[in-house]
Regions:
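Non-cofactor substrate-recognition interfaces
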Residues: 1-4, 10-294
Length: 294
């Protein structure tokens, strides 16, 4: 039995620690054959998205079993690690509920890699799911990708961590690979071969890929270098503005806004959704942050 999850960033799949389903989405079980290996499979996906993967031309080659579940009914089910290179240091590989999961595209099941996405980190923390970290030689937890944009090489990791947590035979082929060609100084950005493609080929051979295709979508790029941006966990300084949120909302009501809708609308809504303020954002063109202690 397989969960059919969808992603536009295959390079984050080795860091997967959860799958998210929607709270109000219905899911069904489909018996079919894998299109790449022709092996029999049973998959779970959103009922609304079945026609996107099982067309009328395919009738007779698949069967919707009739079993169905709402998203929360799948919560807590455990699954096998998709790419077992690194053991997580905590609870992982469970189905969780994510409030941002939709059926606008994909399969209605979202792959969660807490170390490479703010939403992923948020829902994983709420569900008690551990992120997948490595430990470097300094003893610090690090995501699988280093700050140069490549999978950590084994020599930069803590030997004891490597011994106990990494399947070296499986990982060594990909250690040191850049997740985006734009980061690799030795190859051109327009080279056809990418890490994403190589991972897709690997998953095909392992009967773990169901549909692989090119997908055009927006992606953030650095305005100075024109290179793709990675969402990455970094040490930062924060001001705990959430501790004063309720007080600021009260005080906002005493302000005579002109027009009044600014205070109750744009600014008021901003206060209601206030998060802790990150004041030490890391940029390669940044300047030192002055801090005064009183």
């Amino acid at each position: 039995l397989y969960f059919l999850a969808w992603t536009t960033t295959p390079w984050t799949l080795p860091s997967n620690t959860a799958l998210a389903v929607g709270p109000a989405i219905e899911y069904v079980k489909v018996k079919c054959r894998n299109p790449y290996t022709d092996r029999p499979q049973t998959v779970i996906l959103a009922k609304e998205l079945v026609p996107a993967y099982f067309t009328k031309k395919m009738e007779g080659t698949y069967e919707i079993t009739g079993e169905s579940w709402q998203g929360p009914e799948l919560e807590g089910i455990r699954y096998e690690q998709l790419i077992p290179w690194v053991k997580p240091m905590g609870d992982a590989f469970r189905v969780i509920v994510g409030d941002y999961v939709t059926t606008s595209d994909g399969t209605g099941i979202v792959h969660i890699a807490p170390t490479f996405g703010a939403d992923d980190d948020r829902v994983a923390k709420a569900a008690g799911i551990a992120p997948l970290f490595m430990v470097d030689k300094a003893g610090k937890n690090q995501p699988m990708v280093d700050k140069q944009g490549k999978f950590f090489v084994l020599e930069d990791l803590d030997p004891e961590f490597v011994k106990n947590n990494i399947d070296v035979e499986k990982y060594k082929e990909y250690a040191g690979r850049y997740v985006k060609n734009a980061y690799d100084p030795e190859i051109a950005c327009d080279v056809e071969t990418t890490l994403d493609i190589d991972l897709a080929v690997m998953l095909k051979a392992q009967n773990k890929a169901f549909k692989i295709e090119k997908h055009t979508h927006s992606y953030p790029h650095c305005w100075r270098t024109d290179k793709p941006v990675l969402y990455y966990p970094l040490d930062s300084w924060f001001i705990r503005t959430t501790a004063l949120r309720e007080r600021m909302i009260e005080l906002n009501k005493t302000i005579r806004w002109k027009p009044e809708s600014t205070g109750t609308g744009r600014f008021g809504k901003w206060l209601e959704g206030l998060v802790d303020w990150n004041l030490s954002r890391s940029r390669f063109w940044g300047t030192p942050l002055p801090v005064w202690a009183t």
